């Protein structure tokens, strides 16, 4: 009987918020990535009781120095060369942006092929900017040029580029403009999430992946989730990033991640819960039962 040689999982450093109750930030990203087969080294930028969508919460925002201190400890274990990528989301304060970019630099120094995926959490349609007013400019100036993959929602793409997105042509133009500002040594992928445009079929929502090899659009039915569920953007950033690291294909990653996200949100809707049902939907993350195929648009 042939023996199978065991292999170690790949490793991702994820720097985001954390909540004790519910699923946003690292609490929405770590588990899906683990289900995709990754070891995740979680570094938390805040430790809140629950997400801020409830209007009240408790807990601290961590000082930027905490991130560097935790990286010191990880580096002391001699494992940074084994880190395959960095994922960042909600950062909490301006100094934390520089700390995240510093962490990316340290990982790349140890492992030059490591990919940085930046979810530029700043705001959303209907809510406007919900972070400190200084953060959008700092993210644009520091995190975006370091990123290999960036996953803005429609509001954040407009904020980062100054371009209004109302049609598919608008979305492609803005995504290409942002893509030109990403790390020139990387794949330069823009994943535009929660795209709602005037020239799309009714009752649908789309995600657009723009790369140097082409652009793909994935459309799913728009579920009547009111209010919109917090953590959705954190989950899709993690799912897309993980699937891209697994497949090396933006098209495949878009199909698989959006199909998994739809299954997650559909189950959340059917159960009628305020929090996204990550644990209940976990079987959909690696191999979604129903695929929404990405369509090439350029």
UniProtKB/Swiss-Prot annotation:
UniProt entry keywords in alphabetical sequence: ATP-binding, Kinase, Magnesium, Nucleotide-binding, Transferase
Cofactor(s) essential for the protein: Mg(2+)
GO cellular component, one term: cytosol
Pathway: Cofactor metabolism; pyridoxal 5'-phosphate salvage; pyridoxal 5'-phosphate from pyridoxal: step 1/1
Binding-site residues, substrate: 17, 234
Catalytic activity field: pyridoxal + ATP = pyridoxal 5'-phosphate + ADP + H(+)
Keyword Amino-acid biosynthesis carried by entry: no
Keyword check for Transferase: yes
Amino acids binding ATP: 119, 156
GO molecular-function term, one example from the UniProt record: pyridoxal kinase activity
InterPro entries, A to Z: PM/HMP-P_kinase-1, PyrdxlKinase, Pyridoxal_kinase_PdxY, Ribokinase-like
GO biological process terms on file: pyridoxal 5'-phosphate salvage
EC numbers for this chain: 2.7.1.35
Task of the protein: Pyridoxal kinase involved in the salvage pathway of pyridoxal 5'-phosphate (PLP). Catalyzes the phosphorylation of pyridoxal to PLP.
Self-association and partners: Homodimer.
Family, per entry: Belongs to the pyridoxine kinase family. PdxY subfamily.
Protein name in UniProt: Pyridoxal kinase PdxY
Organism for this UniProt entry: Deinococcus radiodurans (strain ATCC 13939 / DSM 20539 / JCM 16871 / CCUG 27074 / LMG 4051 / NBRC 15346 / NCIMB 9279 / VKM B-1422 / R1)
Lineage of the organism: Bacteria, Thermotogati, Deinococcota, Deinococci, Deinococcales
